[in-house]
A protein has these predicted regions:
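Short coil/turn linkers that connect adjacent helices within long alpha-helical scaffolds
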Residues: 36-39, 75-79, 113-119, 155-160
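Structural signature of alpha-solenoid helical repeat junctions
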Residues: 42, 82, 102, 120-122, ...
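Residue register of alpha-helical TPR repeats
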Residues: 45, 85, 125, 145, ...
């Protein structure tokens, strides 16, 4: 992999672009309503949801613009699960903007917030996404560790997404 512009490792590609566009429109409207309402927790949640969809659509710069103004509330609300989703979305947007060094501590924050709240589903997702970012930096050993942690959590939860972690580990073995 190139150090200057590493390829994306197993990036999720939504199967239905039109459905994704509709979801973005719906969540954009929800985000605007929540922004006007002033509920900080609802805003952190709505920002994370919208940013995740934007990143899926390849609009990670827009995702980061949605998230950036709400970092302080996300920090203040770290005792609530949406904060963990917020930091995972933020780190993933940074990752796909090629700002992986900046994403690293944000992935760590997402995992720490999820662990503190015992929110295993988002912990597994953040670990899995972090693993992909590490592969993109040729840090395969660390990536394998994150994928194994994600897989263990997903297996314990009976999550269908455990198949994604298994595929990532198999792809790593082929590198």
């Amino acid at each position: 992999m190139s150090d200057t512009n590493p390829p994306e490792f197993m990036r999720f590609v939504p199967p239905d672009a039109q459905q994704l566009a509709r979801a973005i429109a719906t969540h954009s409207e929800r985000h605007a309503q929540v922004l006007r309402g002033g509920d900080a927790l609802a805003l952190v949640d709505a920002s994370a949801d919208l940013a995740g969809l934007l990143t899926q659509a390849g609009q990670q710069a827009h995702a980061l613009a949605v998230l950036a103004p709400h970092q302080a509330p996300a920090d203040a609300l770290s005792a609530h699960e949406p904060a963990a989703w917020f930091w995972c979305a933020y780190a993933t947007a940074l990752q796909y903007l090629g700002r992986r060094d900046e994403a690293e501590p944000v992935f760590a924050k997402a995992v720490a917030v999820a662990r503190a709240g015992a929110w295993r589903r988002i912990e597994a997702m953040a670990l899995h996404h972090w693993g992909r970012s590490l592969v993109e930096q040729d840090r395969v050993h660390e990536a394998r560790d994150r994928f194994n942690q994600a897989l263990a959590l997903r297996e314990a939860l009976g999550e269908p997404s455990q198949a994604s972690s298994r595929r990532a580990l198999a792809a790593l073995a082929a590198l």
